[in-house]
Amino acid sequence: MTARASGTSGGAVSGIGVDAVDVGRFRALLERRPGVVDRLFTTSEYAYAAVSHDPAPRLAARFAAKEAVLKALGVGIGAADFRDVEVKRDENGAPLLELAGRAAALAAERGVARWHVSLTHTDTVAVASVVAERHR
């Protein structure tokens, strides 16, 4: 399931999720437990962040998006593998979501047809806002 960050909407809102991540705390987690990257992010998500001089804000924004998706689905953190929610970029660089595995199954059960996602980050905070749109 893929979603674009913008475009014409025609369905009803199924769920909304917002999450904020403290970049400093997230950076400290990555330094203390480097293996956590493999549990939270896909290879392409990490590759996108790794080209930055400081990957922590980009990774924190992607983690916020994953949590926001689970909130929009109305489920808890353990309901799906974080790697089942992948933040990609469209041809213009805008974020989009691709769900797989249990996350995709949960979205299908709830009739989610489309996702809208917005990400932002500074050196200190990363925020993601997600809207799940259901079939008409």
Identify what each model region corresponds to.
Residues M1-R136:
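Core catalytic alpha/beta fold that binds nucleotide/phospho-ligands
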